[in-house]
Amino acid sequence: MKVMTLNFLTCAVKNCKSSNDSFPLHPKEAELAKDDIEINPQLLINVLPRIDWAALRTTSTELGFPTLPEQPPSPEDLQSDEALLKELHELLMETQMMEGKLVCGHCGHEYAVKNGVANFLLPSHLV
């Protein structure tokens, strides 16, 4: 599961739908893998407005990556700063969580991640 995907996931427990604490899910005991993918600046420029930057900063820190800037970079920043472009590409596109858990900040439910796939099936008492 790519780090970019984590930015779009929230807790599936019914009681968490109305809580801001259910997003982002927090990676725990994460085993990461890296795929070498050719950098596509236009893809990053197009995806960046859809990313919740505060959540990405949280996830990035929890996974042990360097702290991202307070504000998301503009398309011009990405085009002029090759190091930033490469750093974001590596984090969003190349880094995958292969094993571990995703934990809800509201209810504490843990979603197991195995072979890069998170199990979002809930027991009947949580639906």
Swiss-Prot record:
It is found in: Cytoplasm; Nucleus. One of its GO terms (molecular function) is tRNA methyltransferase activator activity. One of its GO terms (biological process) is tRNA wobble uridine modification. Gene3D superfamilies: 2.20.25.10. It comes from the Eukaryota. Keywords: Cytoplasm, Nucleus. GO terms for cellular component: cytoplasm; eRF1 methyltransferase complex; nucleus; tRNA (m2G10) methyltransferase complex. This is Multifunctional methyltransferase subunit trm112. It comes from Neurospora crassa (strain ATCC 24698 / 74-OR23-1A / CBS 708.71 / DSM 1257 / FGSC 987). The gene is rmt-1.
